[in-house]
C-alpha cells in the first residue's frame, strides 16, 4: 500500500500544575444517585470505575507524557491502576486553596480537562472520574510520584482519612490509584478479568505504541497480558477480521488533521455480508456513531462510485449504494478533537459537525489515491459492492415475489401468526415458539389480549452465511419480518415495531439452544436496535415437574429441583416425590405452559443485552461462521460460564 500521513500525538508545551485544575461544582449526591454518573450499579457500573481511572492515564498518553499503564485485580477484588505520566498535580489549586490532588479526588467536575491548558484532547468529557470512583469506593489510596517525592492520600467513601503527605522518595513520575468498590453501592463487587482485558486491549490498539499490562492476582485465577501495538488501528482492523476471510492483504489506512482535530481510519474488507464499523472519539467508543461515521460513510460511497465510473467498472447510469459499499467492511474510525460534544453522559454519539467535514475531506483525498495506486484491491472492493448491489435488487424482487405469493399485502399477517387484540406496541408481546405442537399449546394458554404467538418450524436459515435476498425468500424468516413490521437492515424502523417484548420460546436442549442462536444472529445482523433497546427476551421453561400427592411444583435447574424436593418432603425425608423431566414445550398442556412460562406474574425471562457490539460480532462469527476450530476453542473456553453467557 502507499504511505499515508500518520497521525501523531503532539506534546502540550505547558506546565501542568494546580492552576490547571478548575473547579466547576462540589461533589454532591454521587452516593445517592450513582447511576447518574456511572450508568448503573450492576456489573457494568462496577467496571466503569476502572475505566474512569484508566481514562485519566490515557489522557496523559494522548498528551504525550505517558507510554505505560498497568491495571491489576488484586486479591479481594481491589483494583490498582498505575501509569508513568507526569503525576496528578500536588501543588495548591488557586480557586480552593487546597492541594490539587485533594481537589481532583473530592470535587466533582474538577480536572485538567476544561480550560484547555492541562489537556488539548481528553476522553473524560465531564471530568467526574476520580471523584466519583472515590465516592463509590469503600476506601481509596492514591500515590503520586512527582518532583522526587511520593505524595499519598487516603479516603473512605469519599471522605479524607489521611491528608496529602510525603511517604518516600522516588526517581520516577506517575500516579498509582488503588481502590475497593463499596459493596453497599453495587450489586456485585467481583471483577471480570476478561471484561477489563478486552477494554484495555481496545485502548492499546487506539494508542499506537502505548504499552498496557493487565494482571489478575486473585488466587486460582492468576493471568496476565501485555499489549502494545505499533500498528495501532491497522492492527485493530486485522484483529477484528481474525475469524473472517479478508479479500485484501493490506489494510487501507488514511489519516489527517486540521487545527486541533485529527482523524485516522483503517479499512479491511472480508468475504462476508455484514458491516462492522467501530468508531471512537478521544478513545471513547461511540456505539451510536455520530458525525465521524456520517462523514466516513458518505465519502466511502462517493469515492467508490467515482472510481468505478472513471475506470469503467460501473457502467452507464449504474451506481452502488452506501449499503452496497459497506458489505463485508471492517473499519476502525478514531478521531481526536478538543471540546468533543457527545450526546448524553454515556458518550454514545459524537455531535461535532466539523468532524464530518474533516473525515469526508481526508477520505476523499486519500482513499482515491489509494485506489489509484492499488487497482487490484480497488477492483476486489468494487466487484463485491456490485455483487451486493445485484443481491439487493434480488432481495427487492424476492420481497415483492413473496408478498404476491403469500398475499402479505395491505397489512395482512402471516398464517403462522396468532395476533393479540391490543394495538399499543408497548403493551404487546410476541412469543416466537419452536414447533407447531408447542405453538398450539401456547395459543390456547396465552392471554390473547396482549400475547401473540408465531410458530417457527423446520430448519432455520443461518443468516451469517446468507445475503438479504435469501432472507426475504426464506419461508421461516419472512413471516417473522412481516409480523414485527419494522423491516430489516437499512430499512429497519423501530418506530414501526408492533411488539415491545419479543420472546424466544424454545426447548431447554441442544436443538432449542441452536434455534435461539440462529434467531439471535438474525436479530443482531439485521435488527440490531431490537437488542440495543432491550426488546428481545428468552423464555426460561422449567426443566422438572415435581409431584407429591396433589401438590405440583416445577424447577428450572438441578439445584432448584433438589431444593424443591427437600421442601416438599418436609419433616419426612422418606416421603415420595415424583420427579419427571420436561422433554419439550410440546409436552406441556396449555395450562402448564401458561403457569410456568407465559404468566407475567410467575414466568422467568432473560433479557438479551448488548454490552459490547465488537465482542458480539466476533462471537456470532465464531459460532455461526465456516471455521470449525475457532468455534470449538470458544465453546471449550466458555463452557464453564454457560449460565452467565450474555450477548
Predicted regions and their residues:
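A short glycine-centered beta->alpha linker in the GHKL/HATPase_c
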Residues: 87-92
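GHKL-family ATPase ATP-binding module
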Residues: 1-19, 27, 49-51, 59-61, ...
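C-terminal interaction appendages of subunits in large macromolecular complexes
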Residues: 390-409, 424-429, 440-446, 459, ...
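Conserved short strand/loop->alpha-helix "switch" segment adjacent to the catalytic nucleotide/phosphoryl-transfer site
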Residues: 32-51
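Short adenine-binding "F-helix/F-box" segment of the Bergerat
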Residues: 93-94, 101
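Helical (often loop-to-helix) elements that flank the catalytic cores of nucleotide-handling enzymes
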Residues: 94, 341-355, 554-560, 564, ...
Amino acid at each position: 500500500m502507499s504511505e499515508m500521513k500518520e497521525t501523531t500525538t503532539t506534546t502540550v508545551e505547558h506546565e501542568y500544575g494546580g492552576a490547571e485544575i478548575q473547579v466547576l461544582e462540589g461533589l454532591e449526591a454521587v452516593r445517592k444517585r450513582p447511576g447518574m454518573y456511572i450508568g448503573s450499579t450492576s456489573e457494568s457500573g462496577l467496571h466503569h470505575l476502572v475505566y474512569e481511572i484508566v481514562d485519566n492515564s490515557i489522557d496523559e498518553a494522548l498528551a504525550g507524557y505517558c507510554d505505560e499503564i498497568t491495571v491489576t485485580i488484586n486479591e479481594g477484588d481491589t483494583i490498582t491502576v498505575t501509569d508513568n505520566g507526569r503525576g496528578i498535580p500536588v501543588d495548591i489549586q488557586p480557586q480552593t486553596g487546597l492541594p490539587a490532588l485533594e481537589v481532583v479526588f473530592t470535587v466533582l467536575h474538577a480536572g485538567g480537562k476544561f480550560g484547555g491548558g492541562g489537556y488539548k484532547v481528553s476522553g473524560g468529557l465531564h471530568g467526574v472520574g476520580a471523584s466519583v470512583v472515590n465516592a463509590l469506593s469503600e476506601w481509596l489510596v492514591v500515590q503520586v510520584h512527582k518532583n522526587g517525592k511520593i505524595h499519598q492520600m487516603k479516603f473512605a467513601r469519599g471522605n479524607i482519612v489521611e491528608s496529602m503527605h510525603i511517604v518516600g522518595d522516588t526517581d520516577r513520575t506517575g500516579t498509582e490509584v488503588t481502590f475497593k468498590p463499596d459493596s453497599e453501592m453495587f450489586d456485585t463487587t467481583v471483577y471480570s478479568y476478561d471484561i477489563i482485558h478486552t477494554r484495555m486491549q481496545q485502548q492499546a490498539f487506539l494508542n499506537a505504541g502505548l504499552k498496557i499490562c493487565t494482571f489478575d492476582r486473585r488466587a486460582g485465577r492468576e493471568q496476565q497480558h501485555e499489549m502494545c501495538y505499533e500498528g495501532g488501528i491497522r492492527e485493530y482492523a486485522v484483529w477484528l477480521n481474525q475469524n473472517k476471510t479478508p479479500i485484501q492483504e493490506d489494510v487501507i489506512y488514511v489519516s489527517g488533521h486540521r487545527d486541533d482535530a485529527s482523524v485516522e481510519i483503517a479499512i479491511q474488507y472480508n468475504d462476508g455480508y455484514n458491516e462492522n464499523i467501530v468508531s471512537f472519539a478521544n478513545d471513547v467508543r461511540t456505539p451510536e456513531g455520530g458525525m465521524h461515521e456520517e462523514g466516513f460513510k458518505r465519502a466511502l460511497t462517493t469515492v467508490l462510485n467515482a472510481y468505478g465510473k472513471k475506470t469503467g467498472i460501473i457502467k452507464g447510469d449504474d451506481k452502488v449504494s452506501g449499503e452496497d459499499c459497506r458489505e463485508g467492511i471492517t473499519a476502525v474510525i478514531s478521531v481526536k478533537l478538543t471540546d468533543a460534544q457527545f450526546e448524553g453522559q454515556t458518550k454514545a454519539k459524537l455531535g461535532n459537525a466539523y468532524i464530518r467535514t474533516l473525515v469526508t475531506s481526508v477520505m476523499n483525498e486519500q482513499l482515491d489515491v489509494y485506489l489509484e495506486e492499488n487497482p487490484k484491491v480497488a477492483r476486489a472492493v468494487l466487484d463485491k459492492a456490485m455483487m451486493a448491489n445485484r443481491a439487493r435488487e434480488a432481495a427487492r424482487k424476492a420481497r415483492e415475489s413473496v408478498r404476491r405469493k403469500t398475499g402479505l399485502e395491505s397489512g395482512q399477517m402471516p398464517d403462522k401468526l396468532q395476533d393479540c387484540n391490543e394495538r399499543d406496541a408497548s403493551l404487546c408481546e410476541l412469543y416466537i415458539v419452536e414447533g407447531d405442537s408447542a405453538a398450539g399449546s401456547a395459543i390456547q394458554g396465552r392471554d390473547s389480549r396482549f400475547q401473540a404467538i408465531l410458530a417457527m418450524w423446520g430448519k432455520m436459515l443461518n443468516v451469517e452465511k446468507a445475503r438479504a435476498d435469501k432472507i426475504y425468500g426464506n419461508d421461516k424468516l419472512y413471516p417473522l419480518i412481516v409480523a414485527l413490521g419494522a423491516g430489516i437492515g437499512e430499512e429497519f424502523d423501530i418506530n414501526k415495531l408492533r411488539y415491545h417484548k419479543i420472546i424466544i420460546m424454545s426447548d431447554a436442549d441442544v436443538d432449542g439452544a441452536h434455534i435461539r442462536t440462529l434467531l439471535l444472529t438474525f436479530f443482531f445482523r439485521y435488527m440490531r436496535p431490537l437488542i440495543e433497546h432491550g426488546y428481545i427476551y428468552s423464555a426460561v421453561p422449567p426443566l422438572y415437574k415435581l409431584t407429591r400427592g396433589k401438590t405440583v411444583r416445577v424447577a428450572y435447574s438441578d439445584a432448584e429441583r433438589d431444593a424443591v424436593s427437600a421442601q416438599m418432603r418436609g419433616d419426612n425425608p422418606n416421603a415420595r416425590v415424583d420427579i419427571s423431566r420436561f422433554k419439550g414445550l410440546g409436552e406441556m398442556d396449555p395450562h402448564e405452559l401458561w403457569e410456568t412460562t407465559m404468566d407475567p406474574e410467575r414466568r422467568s425471562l432473560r433479557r438479551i443485552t448488548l454490552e459490547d457490539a465488537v465482542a458480539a460480532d466476533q462471537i456470532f462469527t465464531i459460532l455461526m461462521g465456516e471455521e470449525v476450530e475457532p468455534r470449538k476453542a470458544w465453546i471449550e473456553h466458555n463452557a464453564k460460564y454457560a449460565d452467565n453467557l450474555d450477548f
